[in-house]
Regions:
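Juxtamembrane/disordered regions of integral membrane proteins
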Residues: 1-142
């Protein structure tokens, strides 16, 4: 079992994070923007996110990409290199970073309408899995 190539891990994580952030812009910033504005208004919050919030969302996307490629690199010796392993890694990261928090905070706590929770969570699986596959494509052990 080889060591994780830290340089490639960082490169792959950045690629994954950028892909996640770009897809998230289209899912939450364009497609779901009216629903987010409505949901935020129901909470008595401004309908649009601030520039600082958008920057923080992008940082979280980059960190998610780094974690996803770290998981990919960690499970690669057991599952083998390739898209199937990247999908497994992406799904694992999506479960922990998107599905569980969205169900807990958006659905169970009734903070946002169910349709918004469903759409943003399903959009998240596309974002994280696609980002992980993109980042894994540049990861190499040596």
């Amino acid at each position: 079992m080889g060591k994780i190539n830290v340089g490639r891990l960082i490169l792959g994580g950045i690629v994954a994070g950028i892909a996640i952030d770009l897809l998230d812009y289209f899912v939450d910033g364009v497609w779901l923007a009216p629903r987010w504005a409505s949901g935020m208004a129901m909470l008595g919050r401004p309908p649009a996110f601030s520039q600082i919030q958008i920057i923080l969302f992008n940082v979280i996307g980059l960190l998610t990409g780094l974690v996803a490629i770290w998981v990919y690199a960690a499970i690669r010796p057991r599952f083998g290199a390739g898209i199937k392993t990247a999908i497994y890694a992406g799904l694992a990261v999506w479960l922990l970073t998107t599905l569980f928090p969205n169900v807990a905070f958006m659905h169970v706590a009734h903070l946002f309408p169910n349709h918004l929770t469903l759409y943003t969570t399903l959009g998240g699986v596309v974002e994280v899995v696609f980002g992980t596959v993109a980042g894994a494509s540049v990861y190499k052990e040596t």
